[in-house]
Structure formats: C-alpha cells, structure tokens
Amino acid sequence: MDNDVKLGRFISLILRHKPETINLKLDKNGWANTKELIEKISKSGREIDFEILERIVNENNKKRYSFNEDKTKIRAVQGHSIEVNLELKEVVPPAILYHGTAFKTLESIKKEGIKKMSRQHVHLSADIETAKNVATRHSGKYIILEIDTEAMLKENYKFYLSENKVWLTDFVPSKFIKF
C-alpha cells in the first residue's frame, strides 16, 4: 500500500470518526482547518504538506473529501460516525437504488431492514457496479440488494445525495428491498 493510500485512510479516520486522535476540532458541519490538520498530522509522525493533502483529495477515487472554496477548510463528504451537519438537501432519487453488503448480513436485513449502524446514514448506490465495489471491500461473499425508493418516497422517507454521489437515507425497511 503506497503512502498516499495509508495517509488517506488516516485522514478518513480523523475527519469521519476520531478527530481526537490528533487533538483536532471539527466545526458543527465537519470542517477542519486545513493548516491545523496538516500540522497535527505532521506532529503524529506522518509526512504531509499542503501539496500531498491536495493530491490525496483530488486523486481519491471515492471523492471522500472536499475543500471549501479557498481551501482553508477540509471535510469528509459522508460516512461519519460522529455527529456533524453536512447541510445536505433533500433530493428525489432514481426509482431504484442499490445496496451492496456482505452476504452474512442478509438474514438480519430481511428481519430488520438496512440500518445506518454506527454511521449517520445508510449508504446507497445509483448503479450495481458501485454497490458491488462497496460490498467487496471487506468480504468476498456479497449480495446486491435492490431498493424501491419510489415506494419509500410515497411513505415520506427522505433521501440526500452527498458531494461524491452516494445516496443517503436514515433507514431502509425490508419491505422496500428486493431480495
């Protein structure tokens, strides 16, 4: 694993889950001061400067991070386990979305639906290929579930679209899932 990937994972840990690891404060919307992030990561023994950080942000294939307009602030665009307000606006999704998951979770999902677990939202994909990539990141055996978002909308479920095009919702009851 190259240094940018390792550093990117560490930045993800900091901005999505544990800013206290390097004693970093995020504002209520999940933004960190870019200069402070670089300084505190450097103090933790990792090599980073603005050029490296910018490369990680720009080249991350999942587009996990974004800068504000003048690049003085940075945040993760979704996937937080800590409470942040990403200022997401409600959006009408396509009629069908997909959820890729480990096969071992299937029975639980049939009984309880898809829960956000430790995150702020359930993550859904607009296409099967993306859902497959999500499902295979931790486990070999996976399943792709089809979500009837049109029916969910009729029952007043809300959907949001993150900056990196991940569809988000609070919960998917099993009655809206095609197994």
Curated annotation (Swiss-Prot):
NCBIfam families for the chain: PRK00819.1-4
Record's function text: Removes the 2'-phosphate from RNA via an intermediate in which the phosphate is ADP-ribosylated by NAD followed by a presumed transesterification to release the RNA and generate ADP-ribose 1''-2''-cyclic phosphate (APPR>P). May function as an ADP-ribosylase.
Protein family membership: Belongs to the KptA/TPT1 family.
Family matches, as PANTHER family: PUTATIVE PHOSPHOTRANSFERASE (PTHR12684), TRNA 2'-PHOSPHOTRANSFERASE 1 (PTHR12684:SF2)
One of the record's GO molecular function terms: NAD+ poly-ADP-ribosyltransferase activity
One protein family per Pfam: PTS_2-RNA
EC number: 2.7.1.-
A GO biological-process term: tRNA splicing, via endonucleolytic cleavage and ligation
Protein name per Swiss-Prot or TrEMBL: Probable RNA 2'-phosphotransferase
Highest taxon above the source species: Bacteria
InterPro entries found in the cross-reference section: Ptrans_KptA/Tpt1, RNA_2'-PTrans_C, RNA_2'-PTrans_KptA, RNA_2'-PTrans_N
Source lineage: Bacteria, Fusobacteriati, Fusobacteriota, Fusobacteriia, Fusobacteriales
Gene encoding the protein: kptA
Alphabetic keyword roster: NAD, Transferase
Organism per entry: Fusobacterium nucleatum subsp. nucleatum (strain ATCC 25586 / DSM 15643 / BCRC 10681 / CIP 101130 / JCM 8532 / KCTC 2640 / LMG 13131 / VPI 4355)
